């Protein structure tokens, strides 16, 4: 009977230690300080020529939603503990590979976002940098046909890369 009581006590201590550890570590891979409670995102402007009219709005919403889903931080309109701002600075279409007739076999759509990140509790994490991602599509497909499929994929990857650089420190 005494062995069972000792075993139960050790089991209880083990469970409490594991549960307490969950407060420190995140299953989403974030490395954000426990001091951080809020985040703010100033609307990213569209500084690039071309692209869908609603691209900056779509990007802003995707970025906010990703932080809300993957952190415990609360959104504030301004002055969050961490703050992101920037603009979409490039929307480019370029040929990737040529065929025998000097035509592009594949085209590449590239989007670049300039980001300024501020962490009010740790200024060493502040940065300004560009994030770029692209998707290729066949030359037989027009940009008008490819845009509705490729732009959301590119924006999703840009959001993930920004999140990893700010919240996951990858």
Model-identified regions with their sequence ranges:
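Bacterial N-terminal signal peptides
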Residues: 9-21
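A structural "domain/chain start" motif
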Residues: 3, 19-61, 65, 72, ...
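Surface-exposed short loop/turn segments
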Residues: 27, 69-74, 81-126, 130, ...
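Second-shell loop/turn segments in exported
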Residues: 46-53, 141-149
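Compositionally biased, intrinsically disordered linkers/stalks adjacent to structured regions
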Residues: 148-170
